[in-house]
Amino acid sequence: MEICRGLGSHLICLLLFLFHSETVGRPSGRKPSKMQAFRIWDVNQKTFYLRNNQLVAGYLQGPNVNLEEKIDVVPIEPHALFLGIHGGKMCLSCVKSGDETRLQLEAVNITDLSKNRKQDKRFAFVRSDSGPTTSFESAACPGWFLCTAMEADQPVSLTNMPDKGVMVTKFYFQEDE
């Protein structure tokens, strides 16, 4: 019994040493995040595309399928991420003005954003997976979720009533190949 406890403590020391060595080798103690492209479409099969500099969701067919916007993602925590389009040059943000909370596209480079800067929190979304679908909640405005309208060709927006069935808040989110 005494031998097992001795072996256990040596094993713990070894693991602590290895784990400490792993994190000391990186400047911030975590792996640098890289941008990845994802396809996104709602549970009603509407994809995102840009119309008049506004992100909308609709049914793209034929030659219009090339209009589909890929979502650029930079993970910042296990379940939080920045979302952008156009190679990360335009980012989705949650903006609150008075009683109004809205989604907007901002001309900001996604790789310049930092989870440690308070002003960048409006660009962060918390990803929640439920089976094959994903929802995105604003980190800056808790309770507000990325959504699409039931009708096609309407702006992608935010809702604080995800369970009312008025807006679609469940998406398929798949890494682009």
Swiss-Prot record:
Any single GO CC term annotated in Swiss-Prot or TrEMBL for this entry: extracellular space
Example of a GO biological process term: negative regulation of interleukin-1-mediated signaling pathway
Disulfide topology: 91-141
Glycosylated residues in this chain: 109
Gene3D superfamilies, per database record: 2.80.10.50
CDD domains with a match to the protein in the record: beta-trefoil_IL1RA
Molecular function terms, GO-annotated: cytokine activity; interleukin-1 receptor antagonist activity; interleukin-1 receptor binding
Cited Pfam families: IL1 (PF00340)
Signal among keywords: yes
Function: Anti-inflammatory antagonist of interleukin-1 family of proinflammatory cytokines such as interleukin-1beta/IL1B and interleukin-1alpha/IL1A. Protects from immune dysregulation and uncontrolled systemic inflammation triggered by IL1 for a range of innate stimulatory agents such as pathogens.
The protein's name: Interleukin-1 receptor antagonist protein
